[in-house]
Design a protein with these regions (language model features):
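A flexible loop/linker signature enriched in serine peptidases of the S9 family
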Residues: 18, 37-43, 58-62, 75-87, ...
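Residue-level detector of Asp-centered blade-edge/turn motifs that repeat once per structural unit
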Residues: 29-31, 69-70, 113-114, 159-160, ...
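Glycine/alanine-rich phosphate-binding loops at beta-alpha junctions
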Residues: 52
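Sec-dependent signal peptide recognition
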Residues: 1-7
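Mature N-terminal segment immediately following signal peptide/propeptide cleavage
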Residues: 19-49
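N-terminal signal peptide c-region/cleavage motif recognized by signal peptidases
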Residues: 12-14
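Signature of short aromatic-glycine-proline-rich micro-motifs recurring in repeat-based ectodomains
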Residues: 298-307
Length: 425
């Protein structure tokens, strides 16, 4: 019925180098540099920050970088040959070399303390939603050796290689904040000689990303609210919060010589293991990033939250955070919002067919925006307060009244019969 819609995303690319909240992911730390994933590629920057250097440029995604103990080599997860496998490359850059060849997904996790083998996770021998940890010689050759653990995902060796701190449970909904169901993550410490374990104490919190440093096992946890850094002392069996809660979750972290690098709100930070002090790492990115250029995107398969105009002539959709209308028969598609920094959701047509209401987070909190169905002029904005709204039709109540003396000024009523003027002064 409706024709395919192609929407021009009017992005605003940076004219020069980029700084600030760049969504720098999965950082790894050596004695001199930090390697991280950005826009599907690996980048390197000095520990003190500065201009980042691009290490990979393949069409697929490269992520999960981990430094060898001497800092000379990086193991990472890549998609160079149409499959997700483990690769290694010099820390200074170079041609990646493939280590794993299983048709399933293999992902880099770490290194053995002697730097001779790469630790990786794979579901190659585990049914359902499980996985196991394996090691493979960094020089290649031979078969992967499976660690003696039934299910294991993330892992970090003790200095002598005799023990491993690991996560023994797969969690399918990792982004569920403050989840307290049956799949909360935990960290166990395994004696690799006999597979006996010690459980790091917790009260059904999500503990993950273990990092062994000296006699301590550092890890990320939401046991006190937002995810931050804690450590477990293997000598005293006590748990201490290393970094105070900041309100924003830490997403990943990696231990290196004398410090831990972690990502928070798209930025990188260093935690000094001796002083306990933290500092932000200022990173500047400059490169050819096609994703930042304005480009056409076919959104025919991404249309959602549809509504039909009262006369049936057009339909409105949400697609990639934009509000679009398309004709039933004749006419052109219309991008009503054309925004670059906001998410617009849940469009609904007014009963008279003249306006379209939708939810927008342009101000930082969701507001009810109303624009004429042609998309011309500024949208009227109705603040909704600091609450969660998921349906513009529910907020609007599908009711339209008129202000006294202003017959062309619609009023939308909220669920508590609160009135908000849309078209009047």
């Amino acid at each position: 019925m409706y024709r395919i819609v192609c929407a021009l995303l009017l992005l605003t690319p940076c004219a020069g180098a980029q700084t600030g909240h760049l969504l720098l992911r999965k950082p790894a730390l050596s004695g001199t540099q930090i390697v991280f994933s950005y826009a599907g590629d690996l980048w390197s920057v000095a520990r003190e920050g500065g201009d980042a250097k691009r290490l990979t440029t393949a069409p697929g995604v490269e992520t999960d970088p981990v430094f060898s103990p001497d800092g000379s080599t990086i193991a990472f997860t890549g998609e160079y040959d149409g499959n997700v496998d483990v690769f290694v490359m010099p820390a200074s850059g170079g041609v990646p070399r493939r280590l794993t060849y299983h048709p399933g997904r293999d992902a880099a996790v770490g290194w053995t303390p002697d730097g001779k083998r790469v630790l990786f996770v794979s579901a190659r021998a585990v049914p359902n939603d499980g996985a196991r940890l394996y090691t493979l010689p960094v020089e290649g050759g031979g078969l992967p050796e499976e660690l003696p653990l039934p299910i294991a995902l993330e892992g970090s060796y003790s200095a002598d290689g005799s023990h491993l701190a690991y996560v023994p449970l797969f969690q399918w909904q990792e982004a569920w904040k403050r989840y307290r169901g049956g799949q909360t993550k935990k960290i166990w410490i395994a004696n690799l000689a006999d597979s006996s374990i010690v459980k790091i104490p917790r009260d059904n919190s999500n503990d993950f990303n273990p990092m062994w440093a000296g006699d301590r096992i550092y890890f990320l946890s939401d046991r006190e609210g937002p995810v931050t850094l804690f450590y477990y002392d293997t000598k005293t069996n006590k748990i201490t919060r290393a970094i105070a809660k900041h309100g924003l979750d830490f997403k990943s972290a990696s231990a290196g010589p004398g410090a831990i690098v972690y990502e928070q709100f798209g930025e990188l930070h260093l935690y000094d293991l001796k002083t306990g002090q933290t500092k932000a790492v200022a990173v500047t990115l400059a490169g050819d990033l096609p994703e930042l250029r304005p480009h056409y995107v076919n959104v025919a398969k991404r249309l959602r939250n549809a509504d039909i105009s009262p006369n049936g002539a057009r339909a409105v959709f949400e697609a990639r955070g934009k509000i679009l209308t398309v004709p039933a028969e004749k006419g052109d598609p219309r991008n009503l919002t054309n925004s670059t920094t906001a998410m617009e959701r849940e469009p609904v047509w007014s009963p008279d067919g003249q306006n379209i209401a939708y939810l927008s987070d342009e101000s930082g909190e969701y507001a009810l925006d109303i624009v004429n169905e042609v998309g011309t002029g500024e949208a009227a904005k109705i603040p909704l307060g600091k609450a969660f709204y998921s349906n513009a039709a529910m907020v609007a109540g599908r009711q339209e009244d008129r202000l006294p003396g202003q017959p062309q000024s619609p009023v939308l009523r909220g669920p508590r019969s609160e009135e908000a003027s849309v078209g009047g002064d």
